[in-house]
Amino acid sequence: MARRPVLARHRIDFRNRVNYIGRFAPSPSGPLHAGSLVAALASWLDARAHHGLWRLRIEDVDTPRTVPGAAGVIMDQLRALHLHWDGEIMWQSRRGAAYQQAFDALAARGLIYGCGCTRREIADSALRGTAGVDGERPYPGTCREGLPAGRQARAWRVRVPPGVETFVDRWLGPQQQDVAAAVGDFALRRADGLWAYQLAVVVDDADQGVTDVVRGADLLGSTARQRVLGRLLGLAPPRVMHVPLIVDPATGLKLSKQNGAPALDCSQPLRMLQQAWSGLGFAPLAAATPEAFLQAAAAQWAQRFGMRHAAVPASPKAD
């Protein structure tokens, strides 16, 4: 008998683009900055250009990194920039039951195992000469056949099947990654009980019905993992687009909260939007208001990324 998909109710018919659902998923570790606005604007424009929905998700699954009040600041910034979202906000910190359900489904099929390795041990493993993803060494599978004597699980990992994952990025073109070789079995839950980002994102995208993920290029390395995990859960993968990062000219580092990027000056929303538009490689638009700018930008976006009809309906305002 064929195996039933774990979350089959979330399968999406990509032939019907009326069903477009995008999302913006900031982590509340600080306010939005110029780099995060580029990703927010691109995802908003793609949703509006496809006459779709734009969801907001607060990715506060890593509670120790959450800054009190930051989520409210982010929402206020989006409103000031006229980037209004559709429907209710999803909070990862309230989604433990959904993550547990997916985790249990994988565990029931023998796809989860406990790992007692420390980060140092993984870095010093026999595979230390192997190039990894995002600066991390691939997990060598030390605990795949069972924990060493005297060890307790520090994390729970998913068994990654062999093979190369291929996909087409709507901005960057064809991509591929051998997840088993480049990453290895990756963690879905930490010893402190916190859920890993990769599991949370896959489950949340499915539950929100997301058809298209538009985000910064720094997350490109996560895409193959998320596709593999989604397939193990019986989920159809969303289309992806990874847009350029904004770099600090003084340091050469990407603008990020960790690197001290300043918060957006939302008292000048039109100027902020124009700068983000420029960061996406577009020429400045002649617009006197944020609303006029967004209307014109969505029309150009539609022309560039395949929509024949550039007229964009006004988006509903969030509560």
From Swiss-Prot:
According to the UniProt entry, where does the motif 'HIGH' region sit in this chain?
A: 26-36
One BP term from GO:
glutamyl-tRNA aminoacylation
Q: Does the keyword Glycosyltransferase apply?
A: no
One GO CC term of this entry?
Answer: cytosol
Classification via SUPFAM superfamilies: Nucleotidylyl transferase
Sequence positions that bind ATP: 257
Q: How is the cofactor bound?
A: Binds 1 zinc ion per subunit.
Pfam assignment, any one: tRNA-synt_1c
Q: What class of enzyme is it?
A: ligase
Q: What are the alphabetically sorted keywords of the record?
A: Aminoacyl-tRNA synthetase, ATP-binding, Ligase, Metal-binding, Nucleotide-binding, Zinc
Q: Where is this motif: 'KMSKS' region?
A: 254-258
The GO molecular function terms of this record are: ATP binding; glutamate-tRNA ligase activity; zinc ion binding
Q: Which domain of life is it from?
A: Bacteria
Cofactor annotation: Zn(2+)
Gene3D superfamilies referenced in this protein's UniProt entry, alphabetically: HUPs
Binding sites annotated in the UniProt record for Zn(2+): 115, 117, 139, 143
Q: Which InterPro entries match?
A: Glu-Q_tRNA(Asp)_Synthase, Glu/Gln-tRNA-synth, Glu/Gln-tRNA-synth_Ib_cat-dom, GluQ/Sye, Rossmann-like_a/b/a_fold
Identify the EC number(s). Answer: 6.1.1.-
Sites where the protein binds L-glutamate: 23-27, 59, 197, 215
Q: What NCBIfam families does the record point to?
A: PRK05710.1-2, PRK05710.1-3, queuosine_YadB
Q: According to its UniProt entry, what is the function of this protein?
A: Catalyzes the tRNA-independent activation of glutamate in presence of ATP and the subsequent transfer of glutamate onto a tRNA(Asp). Glutamate is transferred on the 2-amino-5-(4,5-dihydroxy-2-cyclopenten-1-yl) moiety of the queuosine in the wobble position of the QUC anticodon.
Which family is this sequence assigned to?
Belongs to the class-I aminoacyl-tRNA synthetase family. GluQ subfamily.
Q: What is this protein called?
A: Glutamyl-Q tRNA(Asp) synthetase
**Species whose genome carries this gene:** Bordetella bronchiseptica (strain ATCC BAA-588 / NCTC 13252 / RB50)
Q: Its gene?
A: gluQ
